């Protein structure tokens, strides 16, 4: 039986690698240059919660403590990493044993579910249309979907490998 510690370690390692590649793919789009959908979840959360957080003084306290400005690149990058790792944890704890098939298929299913939520809920709520079609061309939508899918498939495949290795005692990565 796998321990929660090995599950978390495998998820964080797989998630770190997958979010690193995803981030590199999205950065490469900037070099092309190609506009892709990104930051939708952060924009939506900002739209929904910013007024309440401002009234509660969270923004002022945040700045006084010297944390990165939420609209800035550093905060956005950190948010992207944290969400990627949270998605890795969600996969390892709740989805991995429930989704059918091999790891790559589980990753595709996870990618499809999250992409559908982003395309049909998050981006339309932001006024960007289905899959961001109001501001993105077909190539931008496709590139974003591909970078997104790479994250989830790589996450699932690496998680299976690292979790299996840790169970067999073959993985020498320590999270102590």
Walk through the language-model features, giving the residues of each.
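Short, charged juxtamembrane terminal tails flanking transmembrane helices
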Residues: 1-5, 163-176
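N-terminal signal-anchor transmembrane alpha helix
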Residues: 2-38
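Hydrophobic alpha-helical transmembrane segments
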Residues: 8-16, 73-92, 96, 104-109, ...
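Alpha-helical transmembrane segments of multipass membrane proteins
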Residues: 14-26, 83, 87, 91, ...
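Extracytosolic (periplasmic/ER-lumenal) interhelical loops and adjacent juxtamembrane/interface segments
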Residues: 31, 35-70
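Internal alpha-helical transmembrane segments of multi-pass membrane proteins
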Residues: 95-117
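Alpha-helical transmembrane segments of multi-pass integral membrane proteins
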Residues: 115-170
């Amino acid at each position: 039986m796998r321990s929660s510690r090995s599950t978390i370690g495998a998820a964080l390692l797989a998630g770190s690698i997958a979010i690193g590649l995803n981030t590199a793919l999205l950065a490469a789009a900037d070099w092309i240059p190609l506009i892709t959908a990104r930051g939708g979840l952060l924009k939506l959360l900002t739209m929904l919660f910013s007024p309440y957080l401002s009234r509660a003084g969270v923004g002022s306290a945040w700045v006084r403590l010297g944390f990165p400005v939420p609209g800035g690149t550093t905060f956005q990058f950190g948010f992207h990493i944290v969400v990627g790792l949270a998605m890795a944890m969600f996969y390892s704890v709740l989805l991995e044993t429930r989704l059918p098939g091999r790891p790559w298929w589980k990753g595709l299913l996870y990618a499809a579910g999250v992409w559908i939520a982003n395309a049909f809920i998050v981006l339309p709520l932001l006024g960007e249309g289905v899959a961001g079609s109001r501001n993105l061309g077909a190539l931008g939508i496709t590139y974003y979907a591909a970078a997104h899918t790479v994250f989830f498939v790589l996450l699932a495949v690496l998680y299976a490998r690292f979790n299996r290795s840790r169970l067999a005692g073959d993985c020498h990565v320590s999270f102590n």
